[in-house]
Amino acid sequence: MITFSSMLLKLQEFWMKQGCNIVQPYDIPAGAGTFHPATFLRSLDSTPWSVAYVAPSRRPTDGRYGENPNRLGSYYQFQALIKPSPDNIQELYLKSLEYLGLDVKNHDIRFVEDNWESPTLGAWGLGWEVWLNGMEVTQFTYFQQVGGIECNPVAVEITYGTERLAMYLQGVDTVFDIVWGENEHGKTLYRDVHKEAEIEFSKYNFEIADTEMLFAEFNAKSAECLKTIEARLPLPAYDLCMMAASTFNVLDARKAISQTERQNYILKIRELSKGCAELYKAQEEDRNKRVKG
């Protein structure tokens, strides 16, 4: 049986063998792997770029106090981004499942058309969900726009739902029974690593978080992001955009924002991410000269 730790390592190993640079998780909370600058910003460059990484993801509204068998407020995606997109990407994906020990010929694997959109990132793309015996385990997306900018060349993003995939590979019915690792002292389960955090962060995000402080933080990070864009610094500006988005997610979980206001906040974050993307793209030629020395 493959452990959760081994599965993540093998995915990195597989995509590294396909030419992807393995980078580390980003150090700012985000709701999805697409927020990582290695995807959001680097997908805008006109030069080839291939990258893969584990993406710890936080979605406070999805927390369930550790009581739901497959719904979490904090979880892990595995992300691979390849630009330009190879013609055999579906074949490579199936080989990645085989690399994890899955006999793809004896399972019902379906590519179901499902176009993707991220309103806060001004991003959308064409793609599929991948269903493994009736359970969605992966999302494929051919990026058409990121930050409101058309992607040329087009990159393909593969996002694995790692917990769902591990549940299937290990034959368990709840995420908390996933075997995280194993050594001479026995097995470490997902519950040993994460269940208490699910309980405590659910209570914080739904009941305790200081909304007045969070509104002030959102406004401060947004203003600082705009100031940093004006200073022509897209990378720190995008960090501030990510921080504002993360703060919004907690406010959303706290139900501190009405439906009408919610859309306005999403548009504010979209404008910030768009400003970062436009500046990053505009500086591409000069940045390449600086980087190449």
UniProtKB/Swiss-Prot annotation:
<keyword id="KW-0030">Aminoacyl-tRNA synthetase</keyword>
<dbReference type="GO" id="GO:0005524">
    <property type="term" value="F:ATP binding"/>
</dbReference>
<dbReference type="InterPro" id="IPR002310">
    <property type="entry name" value="Gly-tRNA_ligase_asu"/>
</dbReference>
<comment type="similarity">
    <text>Belongs to the class-II aminoacyl-tRNA synthetase family.</text>
</comment>
<dbReference type="InterPro" id="IPR045864">
    <property type="entry name" value="aa-tRNA-synth_II/BPL/LPL"/>
</dbReference>
<keyword id="KW-0547">Nucleotide-binding</keyword>
<keyword id="KW-0648">Protein biosynthesis</keyword>
<keyword id="KW-0436">Ligase</keyword>
<comment type="subunit">
    <text>Tetramer of two alpha and two beta subunits.</text>
</comment>
<keyword id="KW-0067">ATP-binding</keyword>
<keyword id="KW-0963">Cytoplasm</keyword>
<dbReference type="GO" id="GO:0005829">
    <property type="term" value="C:cytosol"/>
</dbReference>
<dbReference type="GO" id="GO:0004820">
    <property type="term" value="F:glycine-tRNA ligase activity"/>
</dbReference>
<dbReference type="GO" id="GO:0006426">
    <property type="term" value="P:glycyl-tRNA aminoacylation"/>
</dbReference>
<dbReference type="InterPro" id="IPR006194">
    <property type="entry name" value="Gly-tRNA-synth_heterodimer"/>
</dbReference>
<protein>
    <recommendedName>
        <fullName>Glycine--tRNA ligase alpha subunit</fullName>
        <ecNumber>6.1.1.14</ecNumber>
    </recommendedName>
</protein>
<dbReference type="Pfam" id="PF02091">
    <property type="entry name" value="tRNA-synt_2e"/>
</dbReference>
